[in-house]
């Protein structure tokens, strides 16, 4: 059964045609009976009201479909840079991906981002060059672009027949046939025909290149070529599949999803070339009991092991937990063990999702993706398994939020509801956070960009019907230190007639930018009943110190912004069994941290953004001056046929309103993407 399953993602730059391609896949595999278009807000995978309004994909919708006895789980991911977290968590659980590229734009900035994310998770992929019917479409230029940008071997298994207005089909280099689609049946009917004489020389040239690439890793094909024999189609497919799994080269297909050309061969390629769940590298897990790493093969007979990769709120069912199963089997009604949180939870129901519709399942097993209902404490990145064999899968890393707005309820009665909704939204989206400002008492929400914040506040106001006022966007700064400092703190207070005492020494030191925070301890732990000896604490007191320091990281040093790139080392403690309490150690640690950091030359860090501007050549000078006026530094430029791409870095604080200014400076012809790059000391 596993070899008949594919878990794939559709990934690309915004507007390359991912959702349209997915719609066509669902239509031709019989999952939907009418093609929905993004432009008229009818796309099946874009089911949120805002997605239909904006014509972009925000959340990664999951759906299951079937093709030639194969089950294909498809995740359609957003291309907009503000929703990178959605792409990240999808790629984490996929076995293969289809990279959709625009035949005109080629490799665009967000293509690079998702490509590198896929590289990080070692996801095998195939490429589909879409929009071959557009003016300026150039399949061969896209091949060159991918090869140069990513340094990968590219190998077309098809070439287009014509381009732009004259695009009419593709030549299949494996079967050496032309494929033409019937427009009257919305491309459902298509036929293979002999290659026209005027196109034969080009087809033979590219087939020879394809066989050269394949034969470099296949003695069998080399032998057949040397003997002048025909190379069977099945052997070619087998060798391509092997190479895709090893990521030796990337097969390229082409078409126009909107014009219903080229989609069925793409689905064939998913089945023929992308891996089954048991063909990718086994999942790496950690056994916290034995403190050892191990590989978990994907098989239904093993102990149950799954990863929660997404949480979605449903007003009737509560939390929908999207789970990828790596081993074993979980049935409806089973108890599962959340390894990280060390808690048991019951799976009330299991669902197979189709965008925002669902069907009930009795069980889910290794390799599959499903939705669990009934889990109360599980969050994105949590591992579910069995208590007898606790294993932890590697969690997911998400970027830090860089932009904030204040929200306040319109009435006191809305206050609790607002907090409840913010908790739901931050559980759904790990790059969205909310906190209370310690000085003003205001609620501050933070996200990845203006669009991200706009989408979330609209969900809060429209979907959850919360009555609240939303402030103007502000930059989310960070605090850090620049020198090392050691500090000792004694705490002594009588509370309720009982002495509370603690004494500890902390060293704080700066870390490299981008390292995050960490807490380390030289202090040993012992059981309460044992004797501590020197420089040792009971486990609950050491936990209290750690908890206190983590709280300090969130609340900042001078201004109240979260800290970053600080290491705190617990150097030594004094322990008196009669007066030591968790409260005393928490208070001592917090005061010690504040004093040490205040003396360690604290600094304010601001987020710096990577900005990519796509501009027609005649406006590129105006576009560049817009970014330099904002204190931006131009790092490099790429030139394409009629477009230049400017790569720059600029402080987030100066980028508000950039979209409007860029549009007016370039008569609305330039566009840009912006993503977080790094924090640096505020200029």
From Swiss-Prot:
InterPro entries xrefs: EFG_II, EFG_III, EFG_III/V, EFG_V, EFG_V-like, EFTu-like_2, G_TR_CS, P-loop_NTPase
Cellular compartment(s): Cytoplasm
Cytoplasm listed as a keyword: yes
Keyword hit for Hydrolase: no
Keywords annotated in UniProt: Cytoplasm, Elongation factor, GTP-binding, Nucleotide-binding, Protein biosynthesis
One MF term in the entry's GO annotations: GTP binding
Residue ranges of every copy of the tr-type G domain listed in the record: 3-278
Example GO BP: ribosome disassembly
Binding site for GTP: 12-19, 76-80, 130-133
GO cellular component: cytoplasm
Family, as annotated: Belongs to the TRAFAC class translation factor GTPase superfamily. Classic translation factor GTPase family. EF-G/EF-2 subfamily.
Function text: Catalyzes the GTP-dependent ribosomal translocation step during translation elongation. During this step, the ribosome changes from the pre-translocational (PRE) to the post-translocational (POST) state as the newly formed A-site-bound peptidyl-tRNA and P-site-bound deacylated tRNA move to the P and E sites, respectively. Catalyzes the coordinated movement of the two tRNA molecules, the mRNA and conformational changes in the ribosome.
Classification via NCBIfam families: EF-G, PRK12740.1-5, small_GTP
PANTHER family per UniProt: RIBOSOME-RELEASING FACTOR 2, MITOCHONDRIAL, TRANSLATION ELONGATION FACTOR G-RELATED
HAMAP family: EF_G_EF_2_B
Full protein name: Elongation factor G 1
Species in which this protein is naturally found: Treponema denticola (strain ATCC 35405 / DSM 14222 / CIP 103919 / JCM 8153 / KCTC 15104)
């Amino acid at each position: 059964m596993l070899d008949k399953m594919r878990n794939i993602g559709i990934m690309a730059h915004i507007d390359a045609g991912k959702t349209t391609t997915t719609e066509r896949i669902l239509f031709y595999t019989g999952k939907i009976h009418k093609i929905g278009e993004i432009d008229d807000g009818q796309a099946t995978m874009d089911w949120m009201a805002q997605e239909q309004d904006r014509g972009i994909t925000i959340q990664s919708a999951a759906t299951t479909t079937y093709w030639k006895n194969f089950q294909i789980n498809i995740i359609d991911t957003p291309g907009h840079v503000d929703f990178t977290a959605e792409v990240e968590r999808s790629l984490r659980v996929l076995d293969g991906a289809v990279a959709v590229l625009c035949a005109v734009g080629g490799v665009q900035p967000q293509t690079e981002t998702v490509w590198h994310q896929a590289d990080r998770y070692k996801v095998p992929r195939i490429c589909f060059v879409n929009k071959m019917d557009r003016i300026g479409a150039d399949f061969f230029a896209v091949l060159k672009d991918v090869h140069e940008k990513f340094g990968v071997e590219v190998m077309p298994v098809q070439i287009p027949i014509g381009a732009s207005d004259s695009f009419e089909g593709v030549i299949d280099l494996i079967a050496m046939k032309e494929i033409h689609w019937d427009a009257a049946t919305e491309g459902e009917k298509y036929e293979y025909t002999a290659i026209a004489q005027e196109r034969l020389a080009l087809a033979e040239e590219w087939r020879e290149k394809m066989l050269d690439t394949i034969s470099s890793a296949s003695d069998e094909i080399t032998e057949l070529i040397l003997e002048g024999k025909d190379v069977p189609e099945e052997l070619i497919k087998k060798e391509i599949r092997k190479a895709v799994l090893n990521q030796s080269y990337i097969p390229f297909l082409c078409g126009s999803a909107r014009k219903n050309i080229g989609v069925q061969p793409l689905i064939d390629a998913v089945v023929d070339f992308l891996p089954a769940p048991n063909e990718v590298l086994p999942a790496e897990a950690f056994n916290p009991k034995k403190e050892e790493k191990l590989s978990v093969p994907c098989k239904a007979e093993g102990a149950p092991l799954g990863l929660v990769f997404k949480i979605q709120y449903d007003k009737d069912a509560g939390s929908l937990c999207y789970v990828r199963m790596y081993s074993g089997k979980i049935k409806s009604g089973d108890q599962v063990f959340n390894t990280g949180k060390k808690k048991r939870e019951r799976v009330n129901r299991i669902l197979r999702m189709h965008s925002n519709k669902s069907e009930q399942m009795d069980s889910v097993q290794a390799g599959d993706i499903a939705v669990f209902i009934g889990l109360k404490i599980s969050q994105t990145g949590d591992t579910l398994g069995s208590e007898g064999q606790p294993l932890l899968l590697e969690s997911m890393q998400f970027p830090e939020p860089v932009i904030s707005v204040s929200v306040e309820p319109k009435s006191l009665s809305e206050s609790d509801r607002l907090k409840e909704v913010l908790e739901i939204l931050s559980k759904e989206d790990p790059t969205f956070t909310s906190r209370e400002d310690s000085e003003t008492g205001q609620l501050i929400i933070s996200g990845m960009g203006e669009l991200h914040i706009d989408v979330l506040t609209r969900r809060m106001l429209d979907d959850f019907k919360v009555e609240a006022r939303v402030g103007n966007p502000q930059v989310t700064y960070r605090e850090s230190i620049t020198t090392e400092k050691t500090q000792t703190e004694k705490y002594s207070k009588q509370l309720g007639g009982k002495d509370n005492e603690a004494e500890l020494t902390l060293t704080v030191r700066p870390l490299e930018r981008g390292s995050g925070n960490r807490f380390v301890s030289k202090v040993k732990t012992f059981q309460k009943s044992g004797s501590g000896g020197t420089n040792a604490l009971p486990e609950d007191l050491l936990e209290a110190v750690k908890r206190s320091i983590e709280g300090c990281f969130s609340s900042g040093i001078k201004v109240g912004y979260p800290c970053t790139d600080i290491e705190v080392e617990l150097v030594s403690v004094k322990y008196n069994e009669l007066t030591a309490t968790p409260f005393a150690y928490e208070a001592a640690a917090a005061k010690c941290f504040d004093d040490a950091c205040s003396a360690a030359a604290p600094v304010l860090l601001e987020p710096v953004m990577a900005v990519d501007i796509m501009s027609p050549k005649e406006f590129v000078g105006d576009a560049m001056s817009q970014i330099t006026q904002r204190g931006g530094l131009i790092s490099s430029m790429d030139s394409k046929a009629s477009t230049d791409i400017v790569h720059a870095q600029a402080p987030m604080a100066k980028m508000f309103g950039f979209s409007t200014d860029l549009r007016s400076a370039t008569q609305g012809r330039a566009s840009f993407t912006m993503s977080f790059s790094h924090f640096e000391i505020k200029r």
